[in-house]
């Protein structure tokens, strides 16, 4: 299968850099899969799973909001955070989920509501990734 160069970058680190056969992430329009020779485009990246097929193996991760620049021979994903399932503290993710759910039960401003929804989505994506690992 044809490959392309993939970089997944966060403000803290170069999360992934190398050849990939496929990358799948959640975008604002739903799940997006990219193969080599994809038409050039820019896409928003939403909170959720990131799956990379590199050297015939699938690598699972969780990313938060960001952007993907897609070119025929290269994809660059810039995201606030990216984590492998083994890096996720399950207890911390459960506590974050509970806090976000409690905040959503209160009367909130529109901004606070959106922040709480994002926090809940992030916590749920992190927990989902750890559940898939087991």
Swiss-Prot record:
- Localization of this protein: Cell membrane
SUPFAM superfamilies this protein is in?
Answer: Epsilon subunit of F1F0-ATP synthase C-terminal domain, Epsilon subunit of F1F0-ATP synthase N-terminal domain
Family the entry assigns: Belongs to the ATPase epsilon chain family.
Q: What does this protein do?
A: Produces ATP from ADP in the presence of a proton gradient across the membrane.
Give the gene that encodes this protein. atpC
Query: What is the recorded name of this protein?
Result: ATP synthase epsilon chain
Its domain of life?
Bacteria
**Gene Ontology MF annotations:** ATP binding; proton-transporting ATP synthase activity, rotational mechanism
Q: Which InterPro entries match?
A: ATP_F1_dsu/esu_C_sf, ATP_synth_F1_dsu/esu, ATP_synth_F1_dsu/esu_N, ATP_synth_F1_esu_C, ATPsynth_dsu/esu_N
Oligomer and partners:
F-type ATPases have 2 components, CF(1) - the catalytic core - and CF(0) - the membrane proton channel. CF(1) has five subunits: alpha(3), beta(3), gamma(1), delta(1), epsilon(1). CF(0) has three main subunits: a, b and c.
| Topology with respect to the bilayer | Peripheral membrane protein
One cellular component term from this protein's GO annotations in UniProt: proton-transporting ATP synthase complex
Give the record's keywords alphabetically: ATP synthesis, Cell membrane, CF(1), Hydrogen ion transport, Ion transport, Membrane, Transport
- Supply the source organism for this entry: Ruminiclostridium cellulolyticum (strain ATCC 35319 / DSM 5812 / JCM 6584 / H10)
